[in-house]
Structure formats: C-alpha cells, structure tokens
Amino acid sequence: MKVRVLGSAAGGGFPQWNCNCPNCDGLRRGTVRARARTQSSIAVTGDDENWVLFNASPDVLQQLREAPELQPARALRDTAIRAIVLIDAQIDHTTGLLMLREHRQPHALWCTAPVREDLSTGNPLFGVLGHYCGLDLNEIPLQGGFDIAGVPGVGFAALPLTSNAPPYSPRRDKPVPGDNIGVTLTDTRSGRRLFYAPGLGEMEPHVWAAMQAADCVLVDGTLWTDDEMIRLGASSKTSRAMGHLPQSGPGGMLEWLDRLPASTRKVLIHINNTNPILDEDSPQRAELAAHGVEVAWDGMVLSL
C-alpha cells in the first residue's frame, strides 16, 4: 500500500495568497527555509494502478499534474482515480470536485450522511455536479469497515472525530458524529495500517485506540499553539475552537504522539501557514525532530 501526500497545508495553502505572516512573507522573500505547500489531500493505492483520492482541494489540478502515477494515459480521457473519499464538508476539502467535472462517468464518491447533507444544501456542490459528470454516492459507515470497488489491496474503516462542522453548516459549533471522520487504511496483504486524521480536535478513546493500532499516523498538524491565530491577529478563535488539537502545551498532539509505540511512524499534515514548524530552521521544527515526528510535504510517499 502506498499513500501519496498530494497537499500538506491547511486551507489557503502556503504561502496563503493574502497573508504576510512571518512564514508567508519569509517564503516569498527567500528569508525562511521552507517548502511551498498546497491544500490538504492524499491518494492511496494497493496495486500502483487504482487509486482513491481523499478530499478534493482547490489545488487538485496542480496536485494531479505533479502526480504522474494518477494519469496513466491509457485512453484519450483517462485517470487512475477510481473513487473519492471526503472526510468532511470543509471548503478546502471539497471545492476541487468542481475542477473534476469533466469525468466521462459519475465519480464514485464516499462520504458520511452529514457531509452529504451539507454538500446538498448549505454548499450544494453535489447538485451542481449533477449537471456535469454526476456522482455515484456511497455512504461511509461509522462502524465497521468498507471496501471500494476497483481498488484491490486496501481496506477502509472510518471513525467519528470531535472537530467542527463547516462555517456554512447549520451544525457549526454543534457537530454531530460524521461531520468529521478519521480513516484507518489497511494493506490487506501485510496487515499494516495507516491512520489518517487531518482534522482532530479531541483525543477520544476510540481515536487513541486506532492510533495505537496503526503502523503510521498521518494526523492534524494545523497549529503549534492553541492561541497562535489570536496572537498573530489572524483570528479570534483558538485552535481547539476551530476543531484542531494544537501540537504544543498540555494535552497537545506532541504529548499524545510521544505515547505511541517507538515503532510507529508519526507524520503531521494539514499545516497552517502560520505554524512555525514550516520553517525548517525553527526551534519548533527541531523539537518535532527530537520527538521523532515528521512534517508532511507535497509529493511525500508513505509505503506500508
């Protein structure tokens, strides 16, 4: 099983188009050693031929151009993407669906019932796509695993996360199970597992159990401190209020990652443009390295 990181940044990417925080300004000026990043998305395959796209970011066309394995060129119109899985209904995880409207058949799309509701009403992307390629909608169960037709070698199992519904959703600040999910990906031959959760606001027992059972965790790296956006004047909300567990501080992501088995590969994804870990020379980045934690980058491949 291979997992390719198509995009590793949070919403807005890095640098964000209208942001002049130390990271974004420094990257543009060449005074900060960092990589540009597109918005969060991954793709997974069990046979190097048939892939599942997780989330469709606004940067999806750029991401696909930079992933030649997703364009096998077997016909005039072709793609290696057999299905799309949405882990939530956030703008930065769904807008790219509109850019994929030229498909010659309905996209096989998997999402939970709350996500389907939001993308049919508050942000009716599903209705819009009905006038183009259309969608073959499949509901993701919140208990037990599921298989995706045409994608051999990979098993999928979702679990609900405590995070937040999108700002446009009537459930904003009062989310229900299924508004956000994490997914365990299992190589059906080796049994090795990767746990994927780019939006994780609270460590609950069932989430912790899934992380402990995984050989690799690819998890929320949005913000370093809980008040990061407030201190910069970029937002009035804390990291946790936005549905993201900060890396540092009591009960932060680093504390949890430290408790995983030494053999577990630990990778952060969905990194906000303000997060100091993007600066490869920052003390925060050095602290991650000391804890054995990696920072995902666009084009990174995880093999299990």
Swiss-Prot record:
Transport listed as a keyword: yes
Xref: InterPro entries: Metallo-B-lactamas, PQQ_synth_PqqB, RibonucZ/Hydroxyglut_hydro
Pathway this chain belongs to: Cofactor biosynthesis; pyrroloquinoline quinone biosynthesis
Disulphide linkage map: none
Pfam families: Lactamase_B_2
Function: May be involved in the transport of PQQ or its precursor to the periplasm.
This protein's name: Coenzyme PQQ synthesis protein B
Species this chain originates from: Azoarcus sp. (strain BH72)
